[in-house]
Amino acid sequence: MEKSRIIIALDYPNEEQALSLVRQLDPAQCRLKVGKELFTRAGPSLVKRLAAQGFPIFLDLKFHDIPHTVARACLAAADLGVWMLNIHALGGLSMMKAAQEALANHPSHPQLIAVTVLTSMDQAALSQIGLAGTPEDNVLQLALLTQEAGLDGIVCSGQEAPALRQTLGKEFLLVTPGIRPAGAAPKDQQRVLTPREALAKGANYLVIGRPITAAPDPMMALRAIEAEISNV
């Protein structure tokens, strides 16, 4: 069975609630994302536990620091057995290269991707922090820098995926948050698409949180999304 393209964001405030969902899942059904809140509360032991159960883990901590510090943090993450981790492209070329080189010989070979422009930021928000151009302009510039650094891909909005796929080639991973099934409210992410739309535009993986984790029946929500994307 092909590994799932759905990454479930474990947006829970504690380990017990996260594990309550995980116990309903099979590693062949999905991948799991552990972010800042859950990692800070539950620690590396939870990541190790989930990885040991066979779940591909995306550790979403968005490292952004001087090159040496980020490189060491990436190695520490890889030692937890994660499938994927991320860093901030705004940390620059040297920082990204240091992270990539640190992981190059790690036995687990985790996927290293970069965050470009946060999906909560529209053009007005970018202007407020001094970045000229549209979100798409900034995403493309940072994506090219990420590829130059030798990373495996980026986190991006599905709306930018067609242009990125054309520019960066078919092997470059596009991991897309801001996914809401048809009819769901967009919440705090501005550049949103349905799962089907995002894959059709070139995304490789879909990060989906509240539409599954906050659903009355999370497994029913997951199955509905799987049905929606089954022929894309």
UniProtKB/Swiss-Prot annotation:
InterPro entries, per database record: Aldolase_TIM, OMPdecase, OMPdecase_AS, OMPdecase_bac, OMPdeCOase_dom, RibuloseP-bd_barrel
User: Main EC class of this protein?
Assistant: lyase
Substrates-to-products reaction catalysed: orotidine 5'-phosphate + H(+) = UMP + CO2
Identify the Pfam families for this entry.
OMPdecase
One GO term in the molecular function aspect is: orotidine-5'-phosphate decarboxylase activity
Q: Is-annotated flag, keyword Lyase?
A: yes
Q: Which amino acid positions bind substrate, per UniProt?
A: 11, 33, 60-69, 119, 180, 189, 209-210
- Which keywords are on file for this protein? Decarboxylase, Lyase, Pyrimidine biosynthesis
Q: What is this protein called?
A: Orotidine 5'-phosphate decarboxylase
Lineage of this protein's species?
A: Bacteria, Pseudomonadati, Pseudomonadota, Gammaproteobacteria, Chromatiales
